[in-house]
Structures are given as structure tokens and as C-alpha cells.
Amino acid sequence: MSVGCACPGCSSKSFKLYSPKEPPNGNAFPPFHPGTMLDRDVGPTPMYPPTYLEPGIGRHTPYGNQTDYRIFELNKRLQNWTEECDNLWWDAFTTEFFEDDAMLTITFCLEDGPKRYTIGRTLIPRYFRSIFEGGATELYYVLKHPKESFHNNFVSLDCDQCTMVTQHGKPMFTQVCVEGRLYLEFMFDDMMRIKTWHFSIRQHRELIPRSILAMHAQDPQMLDQLSKNITRCGLSNSTLNYLRLCVILEPMQELMSRHKTYSLSPRDCLKTCLFQKWQRMVAPPAEPARQQPSKRRKRKMSGGSTMSSGGGNTNNSNSKKKSPASTFALSSQVPDVMVVGEPTLMGGEFGDEDERLITRLENTQFDAANGIDDEDSFNNSPALGANSPWNSKPPSSQESKSENPTSQASQ
């Protein structure tokens, strides 16, 4: 189909309108003309922009998203349907476009209220087959302004203006356009198969050619028959009956699979499934892992306090070799001593009572070097008690020699 351009100053003579059945990444594309609206008999057709050259790669980017092309392939495969197609053909069709754990959901509203049907991978082939068994000779989907989103392991396609078009030849040639929202989830791999199919139907229209109305303009009975719908909410009676049957068939898939795998009788399959379901319900919940109590660290006494408590047993001859800073007692008598508290460790395993103290002293009035050189000033320190072992002077070398022979004689 060719249409001339009405834009002023445009040199384009004609261009082709692309059907939703044609590939979106063709070799030629119609130029975009602002203010020009194009319609076909089946409804508005999306205009496909031209491909653009990727900078630095040197090749043309294929038009559109991979999800759009998968819908085109699905429409093309449905066009190959004939009345000779059997269950194997429909199963191969479903295997090509749907995952093994795919779920298909159809929602619509009838006279008695809203309906929602969800079927699994095993029942999906029969759903598409029921559309053709209901009198349809052609089926395809038209997507307008679809939105694609990338996720961790799948790609979602959300189209708020989706039209499912079916053509019926009996009792009269009728084209049924079902409008609604289509949400698909494609697995992000090489096969790009559908994992989730959710079609929410809003409204439908049934179109009849004017030529047929003109032929039966003088027949009131025929006109009354043509005025009646051949579908309910865009679905034939064959499809509606199958969806109602799926309410029973879907829960029985486990029984059928067990019967096919283990060759058990239906009664035994039902007993086994009920017993396993009862076990899952009665099984006690897994106990949560008990949190081990955090080990509390005991505060270590500082070196100075240890020496002060057991100073009577220490050898006085080695006292001068030790640094006064390390053996200095933590006493409140020392002025201007700052003790810094250590914050809790990372992870929050220790509480406030488990915080340790840093045994670092900051005293600007005390110089450790002067204490070593001046023995008298060190011994007269107010931090030392009256009975401190540091006040007693070490024995001279001659006294120590005189004590050694006495000890040897006693042995």
C-alpha cells in the first residue's frame, strides 16, 4: 500500500505503510512527517524509524528491540497455521516461544463479573489452538508504543495499547479487535523465550465489511443476525470453555505428571500427592539459628597495679632496669591524668560494660627521663606509699657477697 505525502515542501512522492505482520527491521522505512497521521483498516500502525550507524563500530544497529522482533516471529509462525496442524505442531510452537515454567494469564470482565485465568506451560498450546477451533482463521498481535525494561535475568515488555486481531469466516466474515494491556517477560538469553504472559482485556470491537451489509440490506432477519456479536469480550465460546476447564486441569497437572512418570493409578497418585502435601503442612518450621552469646573479655590489670599488689615478691635488684612509665600505678593521686575509653568494636558484639580502657597516660607534668636520672625525686613521689618496696634501697655489692657464703654454708 502506497500513500502520497501531503507535507508542503516535501520531495517524497510515496512511501510504504508497514503491516504488523512485516518485520520491523526491514531495509526501507517511511520518512517521518510531523502532523501526518496514517491509519489502516485494522487500526493505527506504528511508524518505524530508520536505522542509525553506531559511532566507532562501522555497522548498522538492527532496528528495534529484540522483544519486538520476537512478537513479529510469533505472528509469522501463527500465519503458518493450517487446519492440518496437530498437537505436535502446537507443542513445537509453544516450545519455541515459551519457557518450560511459563505462566499465561488472561483477565477480562463478563456480565457476571471479572474473570482471571492462569495456566501453565502444559496447557498453553491448547489455549492458542482453541482460538482457531472457535472459528478464527488468522491471529496476530499489534503493539503500539511498547516499553521495554531490563532486569537481572529477564527483559520485560509492557504495552498498554495492544490489539489482538482475529479474523473469522463463519457465519460471516468478521474481524475481531481485542484491545488491552499486554505484559511479557522474556528470559535474557539467546532464545529469548517468554516466561510470563499477562493479557488484560479492556474492550473489543467486531468489524463487518460494508459490502456484506449492502447485500443483506433488504433482509431484516439477516441484519438482525449480523448485529449480534459472535464473541464474548473478544473470546469465542471454545476459548471460554477451555479456560473454565483449566480451572480444574491446572491443579491436576501434578497428578497427571506423577501418573505419567511412575505409572500409578489415579487413586494412588492422589493419595501420594495428598500425603506429601500433608507432610509439608505438618512439618515443624525450621528452628532459627541460635545466636551464640558474645564472649566477654576480662579487663586486664595494668602492669603498674600488678606490680604494686605483688611487689613484695619481686627482686629488688632488677627494679632499676624497668621503666618507671610501665610500672607507674594508676592512682587518683596523680594530678592531670587522662584515661581514654576505647569505643565498641565493629560489629556491635560488645556492649557498654565490655568496653576496654586504653592504659595510656597523658601527663604533661611528669617526665619519665627525669625520674630515671634523679633517684631521690622518684622515691619521694606522692604516688608511692609508705610501705612501697621502691622506698627500700637495694643492697650494695659487698653485702650481697657476704650473704652468699652464709647461704652456701647452710646448704
Curated annotation (Swiss-Prot):
Domain writeup: The dimerization domain is located in the N-terminus.
Q: What does this protein do?
A: Binds to the LIM domain of a wide variety of LIM domain-containing transcription factors.
Q: Which gene encodes it?
A: LDB1
Q: In this entry, which stretches build a coiled coil?
A: none
> Could you tell me what this protein is called?
LIM domain-binding protein 1
Which residues pair up as cystines?
none
In terms of InterPro entries, this protein maps to: LID (IPR041363), LIM-bd/SEUSS (IPR029005)
The Gene Ontology CC terms held by the record are: nucleus; protein-containing complex; transcription regulator complex
Q: Where is this region: Disordered?
A: 284-330, 367-411
GO molecular function terms here? Answer: LIM domain binding; protein homodimerization activity; transcription coregulator activity
Q: What is its main location?
A: nucleus
Keyword entries, A-Z:
Nucleus
The protein's assembly and partners: Forms homodimers and heterodimers.
